[in-house]
Amino acid sequence: MALWGWRGVGRRPTFFVFASLAPIGRDFLRRNGDDARMMGHLEKLLAPTLDAMGYEVVRVTLLGSQNPTLQVMAERLDGVAMTVSDCETISRALGALLDVEDPIAGRYSLEISSPGIDRPLTRPKDYARFAGHEARIETDRLIEGHRRMKGLLLGIDEDRTVRLRLIEGKAAEDGTLPEVEIPFGAIVKAKLLLTDALIAKALKDAEALADEGEAAGGAVEGGVA
């Protein structure tokens, strides 16, 4: 087993990589079946461990087949920014779990990352959390004549319909841009666009968490005194 670690700067995510030295087996996809189904299985397998540690799965992705890399994107439940130390902690815990469960045939690497500012949108709650920010969405079918759309997120309805105001395209006579409704299940890929507003939100959230931490520390010190 080998470990590597490095930290990104600014918008770039933080990574920590764990490499398993298991012998190379048959082609991963042929042995384990459908990629999407396998990722769903792995997410369900990993989620309880992460939750118990104070983290949450954002996305599980597989790259490659002969020597696959399993990428696990995670975030802290308390909202604090991920660090290399967090990624290392997750890597060791999930590495041990995967060694026991052995869901992957052959040699593989486990890569842990944080979402970054211009993060992927993978869960229904992400569309509510980042309403008011711009995103790029790709679907598996035509939606209002589009499969790739860029627009302002307006939120998500109870029936899991994502609402998006397009920022590209022909405006109506009153100057408003068209709005589209996208079934969550039709979304293949979605990601926030890096904008000044998104960066400002990230900085504001970080400052708020820092203030909360200082306030909590002051309260504890006052209680001890």
UniProtKB/Swiss-Prot annotation:
<dbReference type="Pfam" id="PF02576">
    <property type="entry name" value="RimP_N"/>
</dbReference>
<dbReference type="InterPro" id="IPR035956">
    <property type="entry name" value="RimP_N_sf"/>
</dbReference>
<dbReference type="InterPro" id="IPR036847">
    <property type="entry name" value="RimP_C_sf"/>
</dbReference>
<dbReference type="InterPro" id="IPR028998">
    <property type="entry name" value="RimP_C"/>
</dbReference>
<dbReference type="GO" id="GO:0005829">
    <property type="term" value="C:cytosol"/>
</dbReference>
<dbReference type="GO" id="GO:0006412">
    <property type="term" value="P:translation"/>
</dbReference>
<dbReference type="InterPro" id="IPR003728">
    <property type="entry name" value="Ribosome_maturation_RimP"/>
</dbReference>
<dbReference type="Pfam" id="PF17384">
    <property type="entry name" value="DUF150_C"/>
</dbReference>
<comment type="similarity">
    <text>Belongs to the RimP family.</text>
</comment>
<dbReference type="InterPro" id="IPR028989">
    <property type="entry name" value="RimP_N"/>
</dbReference>
<protein>
    <recommendedName>
        <fullName>Ribosome maturation factor RimP</fullName>
    </recommendedName>
</protein>
<dbReference type="GO" id="GO:0000028">
    <property type="term" value="P:ribosomal small subunit assembly"/>
</dbReference>
<keyword id="KW-0963">Cytoplasm</keyword>
<keyword id="KW-0690">Ribosome biogenesis</keyword>
<comment type="function">
    <text>Required for maturation of 30S ribosomal subunits.</text>
</comment>
